[in-house]
């Protein structure tokens, strides 16, 4: 008798959980996969969409490469990427009958940041490359105080790392002593707490706790990034399989950045809207 | 060795052993206390009127009337502050004032046309207006206080002229008056500095009280409300009252931080009384009071965890673990029963035992890899990361724990029980089901609960097999749908879900916004720890009851 | 029924008390029962064998996905790959010419594990000694739940603690240039390995039995001497098993090292400098897996790292199994 009661209780709990979970009717669904940099914009767009249209949007932030792979495998509708497709990825996509179309929704600048107490105000691209390759080890060589440089980089699988690697380091390998962090907020936290640290983060992470350096004489601002004048500016992409069908949810999502609301979300998240120049 | 030395060593050893246990208890406290301290502030905190506004608008909680009254009170208290700010802003932003002057001049031309003034008078009036406009612009653009004031006086001298009555030019005189007020008090040359500082002050006011009246609604929910908690309000207040600058301490030395009081920055200007007003009246402006936000465990998050709670994550974790148990419990208990009761003592069984122990030792990330390679990639019926794949992976993780605990529990059942049952004529299977298993039930239950808590806390196996950072709560349809179409239940299992364990990781290293709300980060981790702790304490209680039952004391 | 007993058919045994049928039926009489009994046992064996199936499948899939990394055509390139994997310290999978040198990762895993054991083993053994021999029963009842709670805290909570609380503390109070380093990871791993070490070594010491202890006391030894010179050596196999199980736990831990170790793929130089960041195998798999496209070289390389991890923990498991069987023998009164 007691056993039957316990069993019945379990069944009721299970049914209850599931009906709490899915009491709604079938909604239109959208699946996004990809970069952790574009992720916050995707999140905010998704939230605005859910409020307006009542659809269901799933956002996975596992990395640019995985997002593109998911698009090729057909597991997602939109891939978010902070870099363009690599040639092998493009070839694999075409081989699988997927023809990726890029939508640029915002621009981002990779800013080199240091602790606010660091007297150094600007560096050249070559100097930054030397720091990350281990050739410059102390701030006094650059006109700062006598402190060892703690170089911090995003880990090798991130799109931000790839852009930095390509444009600043010119594809050379980093020094073995460089510390790797998983994501932008960690890099920001490390610089905030360590006086001798140098790192690179997206534009949206600049605040009063860190100081951005001028690179080659140009300060990363909305204008310089949108014009491409700043050394490490990059577009942020959404990739779809072919141009999305007009009027579909995917299409609405991909052109959302053109609306006023989309632009203000992009700016509020700390990125540069395309029309900033 | 001398006896005293040996006794001393003995005492020292005992002391060291006792100290080590104390250290371990200390470690537990050091780990748990900060988590709970900061995590509980997500549930118990001092809220402000902004929080109540948020709750009303997103979840429709709270008494409408009382809230309205309160909102009116705070608005009344805030109005003077907004007025001071608006006055000063109007007077400082010379670029927009120049634009307005030009606008007014154009409008005046239209006004004259509208009133059909004869042509020569028209040209005359327009020329005079142009003069006034140019003087005004000269006043706005000059850096020299004397020139500014002289030009403003010239403009304002024209105020009495009757031809300008009821015309748009009146507005120009109002602007001139306001700018005169500002120009008398500030150092005109440092206008741009005042402008930058004013922008920081305005941002701080927005952080405290929400968007300024008359501004468009910002797109992100986090900007649509002011400070919802008193601790965040205190931070914004600090930014309002103090500015910080990094000044040089000498060549080759790091810069040092200097705090500059904003009262000094704006000393003598119209903005100065604002700071005192805000600081002294903060209670009336925000109406703080204590709140127990227990809905934290039910609500969904708003704006990347800036507001809201962890409800769907808890639901996701529960779904994953319960489904994992559905797979693991039958397999585990039956395997344990077989191993104890039926298994012969040959090398096949030794192999099985060895495999079970191996399973217990596999690292959790390798489970994740296996789950990815097998459940997601190889089994095409599943094909993508989803609840089903993640639960299957978790069930394999939980299996060895259940088997071990059940085996021990079944072994502990005294042989006399079995002998008595057999003597009464029951077969071996009957004995197992009706006598042994119920007697071993507390131990088996303990094992189940322990594996449940392990499955709830694991992140690595579910990373690639079915968990997402943001997504809808999985839709299983309603019971009526299941009757019509049983396949829809399976469809529900093919969706990914959020989970507490992955959410804690994501929020710790993820969005920038999470860094602004540490109470949310700690709150999620605390929820996970609470869940696991409750399960474990239940297991401990059951086990102590069981030991009483089986031992008889 | 007694009347029926008197009328039993020829061939059936006569029971003392009459039953309607004999107690033990031959297969020919009760085919259904016979078959179902054996079928049932077979089914139960198969169900139990799912664990075996699971282990075999795990090994199969991990090996299957690692082979394409080594076998790219010729045996020579395969051997070169193996050499690069185990001897090269550069892990640059997304460079233009990718290098998959996992030496730094392997050394990193071992580094934090040994660091964790250095802290956890003395602490754990002392606590085990205290709980098995010195503590009164009531204190033991209190300490057991404490240790179980320590074991139950999820690893992501420990990782969170390491990043948010321990790392800033290390930076401010010990003056390290970075708070997420090998020392941070070792400390947390030690805390995670402690419960295993304490419980297994306590079991081993209790299994020794009272006789050895009483003999030692009878000869006039103090408690410390008994523990150090008699009990610990007698339980050495169990204690070694405890250490190995703790090591298995530490090496297999993912979330804590991913968040707290700094993820710098290099070998600390000088080797005793624990304030430098390192990267472990588990953190590499967890961190890189999200970015790698399926069935690319990087994907296979990550599975190879997983295979290394699996082989390592499996061998540790086998050794500790063997050692634990020794305490089984002790318990039953052997040796």
PLM region spans:
Chain A
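Positively charged n-region of N-terminal signal peptides that target proteins for export
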Residues: 1-4
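Short amphipathic alpha-helical "recognition" segments used for binding
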Residues: 6-7, 22
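Bacterial N-terminal signal peptides
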Residues: 8-16
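Exported/periplasmic ABC-transporter solute-binding proteins
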Residues: 20-277
């Amino acid at each position: 008798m007691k056993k039957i009661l316990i069993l019945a209780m379990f069944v009721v709990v299970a049914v209850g959980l599931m009906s709490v979970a899915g009491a709604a009717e079938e909604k239109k669904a959208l699946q996004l996969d990809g970069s952790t940099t574009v992720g916050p914009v995707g999140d905010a767009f998704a939230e605005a969409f859910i409020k307006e249209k009542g659809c269901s949007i799933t956002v996975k932030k596992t990395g640019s490469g995985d997002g593109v792979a998911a698009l090729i495998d057909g597991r997602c509708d939109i891939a978010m990427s902070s870099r363009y497709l690599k040639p092998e990825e493009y070839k694999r996509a075409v081989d699988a009958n997927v023809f990726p179309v890029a939508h640029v929704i915002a621009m981002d600048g990779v800013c080199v940041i240091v602790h606010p107490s660091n007297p150094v105000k600007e560096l050249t691209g070559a100097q930054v490359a030397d720091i990350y390759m281990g050739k410059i080890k102390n701030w006094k060589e650059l006109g700062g105080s006598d402190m060892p440089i703690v170089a911090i980089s995003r880990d090798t699988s991130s799109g931000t790392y790839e852009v930095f690697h390509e444009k600043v380091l010119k594809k050379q390998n980093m020094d073995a002593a460089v510390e790797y962090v998983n994501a932008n907020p960690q890099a920001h936290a490390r610089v905030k707490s360590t006086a001798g640290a140098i790192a690179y983060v997206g534009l949206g992470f600049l605040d009063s706790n860190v100081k951005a350096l001028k690179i080659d004489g140009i300060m990363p601002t909305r204008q310089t990034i949108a014009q491409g004048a700043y050394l490490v500016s990059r577009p942020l992409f959404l990739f779809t399989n072919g141009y999305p069908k007009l009027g579909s949810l995917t299409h609405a999502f991909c052109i959302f950045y053109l609306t006023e609301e989309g632009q203000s979300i992009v700016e509020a998240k700390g990125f540069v809207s395309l029309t900033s120049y | 060795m001398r006896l005293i030395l040996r006794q001393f060593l003995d005492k020292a050893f005992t002391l060291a052993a006792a100290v080590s246990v104390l250290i371990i208890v200390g470690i537990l406290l050091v780990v748990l206390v900060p988590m709970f301290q900061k995590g509980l502030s997500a549930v118990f905190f001092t809220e402000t009127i902004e929080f109540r506004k948020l709750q009303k608008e997103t979840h429709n909680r709270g008494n409408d009337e009382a809230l309205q009254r309160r909102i009116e009170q705070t608005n009344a208290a805030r109005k003077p502050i907004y007025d001071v700010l608006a006055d000063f802003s109007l007077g400082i932003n010379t670029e927009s004032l120049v634009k307005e002057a030009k606008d007014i001049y154009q409008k005046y031309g239209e006004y004259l046309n509208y009133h059909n003034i004869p042509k020569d008078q028209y040209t005359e009036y327009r020329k005079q207006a142009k003069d006034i406009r140019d003087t005004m612009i000269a006043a706005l653009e000059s850096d020299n206080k004397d020139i500014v004031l002289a030009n403003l006086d010239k403009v304002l001298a024209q105020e009495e002229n009757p031809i300008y009555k009821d015309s748009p030019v009146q507005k120009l005189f109002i602007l001139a008056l306001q700018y005169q007020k500002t120009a008398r008090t500030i150092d005109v040359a440092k206008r741009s500095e005042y402008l930058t500082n004013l922008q920081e002050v305005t941002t701080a006011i927005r952080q405290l009280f929400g968007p300024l009246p008359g501004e468009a609604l910002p797109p992100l929910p986090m900007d649509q409300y002011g400070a919802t908690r008193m601790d965040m309000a205190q931070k914004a207040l600090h930014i309002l009252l103090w500015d910080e600058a990094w000044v040089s301490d000498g060549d080759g030395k790091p810069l040092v931080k200097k705090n500059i009081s904003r009262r000094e920055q704006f000393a003598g200007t119209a903005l100065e009384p604002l700071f005192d007003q805000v600081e002294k009246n903060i209670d009336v402006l925000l109406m703080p009071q204590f709140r127990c936000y227990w809905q934290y465990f039910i609500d969904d998050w708003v704006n990347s965890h800036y507001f809201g709670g962890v409800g769907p994550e808890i639901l996701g974790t529960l779904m994953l673990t319960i489904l994992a148990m559905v797979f693991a419990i039958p397999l585990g208990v039956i395997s344990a029963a077989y191993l104890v009761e039926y298994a012969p003592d040959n090398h096949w069984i030794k192999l099985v035992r060895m495999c079970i122990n191996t399973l217990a030792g596999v690292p959790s990330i390798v489970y994740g890899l296996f789950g990815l390679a097998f459940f997601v990639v190889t089994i095409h019926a599943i094909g993508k990361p989803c609840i089903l794949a993640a639960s299957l992976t978790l069930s394999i993780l939980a299996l060895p724990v259940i088997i071990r605990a059940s085996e021990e529990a079944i072994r502990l059942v005294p042989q006399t029980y079995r002998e008595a049952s057999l003597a009464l004529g029951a077969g071996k299977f009957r004995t197992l089901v009706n006598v042994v298993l119920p007697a071993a039930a507390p131990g088996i239950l303990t094992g189940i609960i322990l594996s449940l808590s392990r499955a709830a806390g694991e992140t690595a196996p579910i990373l690639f097999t079915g968990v997402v950072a943001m997504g809808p709560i999985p839709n299983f349809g309603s019971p009526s749908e299941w009757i019509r179409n049983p396949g829809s239940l399976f469809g529900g299992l093919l969706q990914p879900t959020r989970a507490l364990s992955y959410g804690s990781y994501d929020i710790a290293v993820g969005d920038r916004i999470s860094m602004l709300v540490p109470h949310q980060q700690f709150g999620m981790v605390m929820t996970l720890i609470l869940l696991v702790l409750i399960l474990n304490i239940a297991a401990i209680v059951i086990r102590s009851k069981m030991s009483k039952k089986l031992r008889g004391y | 029924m007694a009347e029926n007993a008197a009328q039993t058919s020829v061939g059936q045994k006569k029971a003392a008390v009459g039953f309607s049928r004999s107690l033990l039926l031959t297969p020919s009489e009760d085919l259904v029962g016979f078959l179902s009994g054996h079928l049932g046992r077979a089914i139960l064996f198969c169900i139990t064998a799912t664990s075996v199936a699971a282990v075999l499948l795990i090994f199969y899939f991990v090996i299957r996905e690692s082979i394409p990394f080594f076998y790219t055509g010729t045996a020579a390139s395969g051997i070169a790959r193996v050499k690069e994997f185990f001897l090269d310290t550069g892990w640059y999978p997304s460079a233009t010419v990718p290098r998959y040198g996992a030496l730094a990762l392997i050394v990193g895993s071992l580094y934090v594990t040994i660091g964790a054991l250095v802290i956890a083993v003395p602490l754990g053994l002392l606590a085990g000694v205290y709980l098995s021999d010195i503590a009164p029963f009531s204190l033991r009842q209190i300490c057991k739940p404490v240790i179980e709670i320590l074991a139950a805290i999820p690893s992501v909570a420990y990782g969170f603690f390491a990043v948010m609380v321990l790392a800033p503390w290390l930076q401010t109070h010990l003056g390290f240039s970075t708070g997420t380093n090998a020392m941070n990871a070792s400390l947390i791993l030690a805390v995670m390995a402690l419960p295993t070490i304490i419980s297994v070594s306590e079991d081993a010491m209790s299994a020794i039995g009272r006789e050895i202890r009483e003999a030692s006391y009878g000869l006039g030894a103090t408690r410390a001497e008994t523990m150090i010179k008699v009990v610990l050596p007698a339980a050495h196999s169990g204690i070694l098993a405890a250490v190995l199980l703790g090591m298995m736990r530490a090496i297999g831990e993912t979330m804590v090292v991913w968040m707290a170790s700094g993820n710098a793929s290099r070998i600390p130089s000088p080797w005793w400098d624990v304030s430098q960041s390192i990267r472990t195998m588990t953190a590499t798999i967890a961190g890189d897996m999200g970015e790698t496209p399926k069935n690319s070289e990087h994907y296979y390389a990550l599975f190879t790292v997983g295979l290394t991890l699996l082989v390592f923990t499996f061998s540790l498991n086998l050794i500790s199994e063997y050692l634990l069987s020794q305490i089984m023998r002790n318990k039953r009164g052997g040796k």
